[in-house]
């Protein structure tokens, strides 16, 4: 196992192991692509998901439950993947790439390469092994998207900055004149030398100021391109992405972008200013004294060696630090979202202890990273100080021997700072570039995910949403788990009012989310009229099909802003008022100090559950879609309010409305009831028809 691939997040150990095995056989695929193939979610990757991924990529991957005697076999196929229980009692995967005697060599995506005895390994090993081997028709392939070069087009946009930079460089021509004049005049006049040195130091201040200013300017321009580009891409991703990622993981990558911006901005200046200064001043130094300049260059290999030695350590430390930071972010965000539950169960200490433990881990990883940086900087300083002493030592000897003048030595040392500082800037890019490389891998995990379908070549008429909806043998499962829907075939008639009923977990909400294309069916087809929903771009479909969840989200803004959210233009006030009246909201709004201009808190925290649901219903009515899906959207209402709102919705003759409800009073009012049980369609008909038959609906009715 030549190179280990570290997991970017705690749930990525399985896909990191897959990536290592693939790389061993010449294939490189992004971690995010492997997450999609293996069905990795918030619970991690299953052994079944790993096996199926290898099979999709041209491998056989038999899985076995084995014992310690396996490690004594001479022909055990390596590398293989082993399932273990980590020290933190988490399920974990590692790659075993070498077995010799009573020792096992492991590539752990969380820790790196480790060597253990068989007895030590057996204490954590569950006995599960996967043996991936390429089939005869297997062909290696390489899919790379994590190069920093993907951001270079952003730099090209900064043409005005480059012109400014070249203008600054050209204005430094005066320094070149001084560098040439001083050596010729130093012997004859101390005054000229002193004045020249003052100009040199003034130029040094100007150079540093210009460098810092340009760094800030380029950084801000790039921040807008990279960070806003990332956020825009995240918004375009399918709902399935958010179901398999913690909020902290997504946000931490947004913050990681700063490392990329810092590195690229610094690299831009180094390529233009620092390298230019090194060449310009280096030429001047060589003219001053070839021997001293050669001595200066002799220390470059030592700098390069120090940089090279720390490359792998920096990669590991940065990956661990960023991953630990994502865990802390996730826990804090999760805790703030669930503060009511935490308070209800006196769980403050439990939550604090968990965050405290994760934060201590982050501090340890951060300390390790900073310590590496300190050690490297100390080594660089040793080289710099020794080189300075040797240059003065040798230079003074040359002055004594009459090979150079004292003025030449003073001038050389005065100019040397303009050679060493830009050189240090270039060398110090290593730390920033390595952090950026790790951050870029994490960022590109998200950027490489395909956004939701936007454009299709099929011209879609809005009239198709006034036609029947058909499901033909539709099945669906989340991330290679047990099917939630199984072979469902049904027809929902245009402008009908339909209720989906069944016990919890029967697949009602999942079916609704398929209709609005939050997810795609694993098998089968859904059609609106005669058009397959896969041929309808998501944005257009959701203009005509509105989904109202049980817990709708409200933004920090006025009531009217939240009611009209997502609309291309604000409707007339009369239309807004009618929608609020239909949702029984008028009295509530009249009680607010600024009525429609009253401000809602983030998440609607100053509203009750019932008030939120009525606002969500009013928003759906105002959206005026041909099809509306209410997913338990009246569960927080009292019986009288629910009845009044339901009567209005049932009377909407021009709309197809689908209700998902546990309250059978809603089902009774509908034209048709569809009954699901464990993902299977087990009945359909009116309330009267189903209540007379023995089955799930009758059991729900009698419960």
UniProtKB/Swiss-Prot annotation:
Q: Give the membrane topology, semicolon-separated if more than one.
A: Multi-pass membrane protein
Q: Which residues form the active site?
A: 13
Cite the ABC transporter domain residue spans from the record.
469-703
Domain of life per record: Bacteria
Q: Where is the Peptidase C39 domain?
A: 7-132
Q: Which residues cross the membrane?
A: 162-182, 189-209, 224-244, 267-287, 291-311, 381-401, 409-429
What EC number(s) does the entry state?
Answer: 3.4.22.-, 7.-.-.-
Can you give the residue ranges of the ABC transmembrane type-1 domain? 153-435
Per the record, the GO terms for biological process are: antibiotic biosynthetic process; protein transport; proteolysis
Q: What is its main location?
A: membrane
**KW Cell membrane (keyword) present:** yes
Entry's Gene Ontology molecular function annotations: ABC-type bacteriocin transporter activity; ATP binding; ATP hydrolysis activity; ATPase-coupled lipid transmembrane transporter activity; cysteine-type peptidase activity
Per UniProt, ATP binds at 502-509
Q: Which PROSITE patterns match?
A: ABC_TM1F (PS50929), ABC_TRANSPORTER_1 (PS00211), ABC_TRANSPORTER_2 (PS50893), PEPTIDASE_C39 (PS50990)
Q: Does the keyword Transmembrane helix apply?
A: yes
Name where it's found. Answer: Cell membrane
What cellular component terms from Gene Ontology apply here?
plasma membrane
Q: Tell me which UniProt keywords the record has, alphabetically.
A: Antibiotic biosynthesis, ATP-binding, Bacteriocin transport, Cell membrane, Hydrolase, Membrane, Nucleotide-binding, Protease, Protein transport, Thiol protease, Translocase, Transmembrane, Transmembrane helix, Transport
Family recorded in the similarity comment: Belongs to the ABC transporter superfamily. LagD family.
Subunit field text: Homodimer.
Domain remarks: The first 150 amino acids are capable of cleaving the signal sequence of LagA, the lactococcin G alpha precursor.
Q: What does this protein do?
A: LagD (TC 3.A.1) is involved in processing the signal peptide and probably also in export of the bacteriocin lactococcin G.
Q: What is this protein called?
A: Lactococcin-G-processing and transport ATP-binding protein LagD
Gene name tied to this protein: lagD
